[in-house]
């Protein structure tokens, strides 16, 4: 695992925490792990990508890599939740811009949603898992994957 991200699958929820935008090698590794865990679990994963509040804004190349990750991740994941942590203007703008891009590119098909914190993901996880996700989120917090 790269020191530039942390990743763990709890139940069938894949948590990935990025303190900075992932590199090409990171994206390749995450996609390989998605495939491996998808095969191990036997069902599509529920992806929760956590973007640290102090993460730098991705440049054009990094945005393309993130787009590739989400596009290819559809092969292994039922849904992708992108949590952009923080209350600063930069964090709010990132959430608004990504939400706007989903609409502009007409990819608003329910696969990707943008959140401010991991707690706002809980209702969807509960629906998809058919059980209370609180222990899963608690474990992710204990592992430093969520705040």
Which sequence ranges carry the predicted segments?
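Amphipathic, Lys/Arg-enriched alpha-helical "gate/interface" segment within cytosolic domains
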Residues: 2-147
């Amino acid at each position: 695992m790269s020191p530039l991200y942390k990743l763990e699958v709890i139940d069938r929820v894949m948590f990935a925490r990025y303190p900075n935008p992932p590199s090409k090698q990171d994206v390749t590794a995450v996609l390989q792990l998605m495939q491996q865990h998808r095969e191990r679990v036997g069902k599509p994963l529920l992806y929760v990508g956590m973007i640290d509040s102090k993460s730098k804004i991705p440049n054009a190349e990094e945005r393309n890599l993130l787009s590739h990750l989400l596009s290819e991740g559809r092969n292994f994941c039922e849904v992708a939740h992108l949590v952009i942590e923080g209350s600063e203007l930069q964090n709010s703008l990132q959430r608004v811009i990504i939400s706007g891009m989903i609409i502009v590119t007409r990819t608003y098909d329910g696969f990707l949603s943008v959140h401010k914190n991991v707690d706002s993901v809980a209702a969807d996880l509960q629906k998809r898992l058919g059980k209370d996700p609180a222990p899963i989120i608690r474990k992710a917090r204990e592992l430093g994957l969520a705040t």
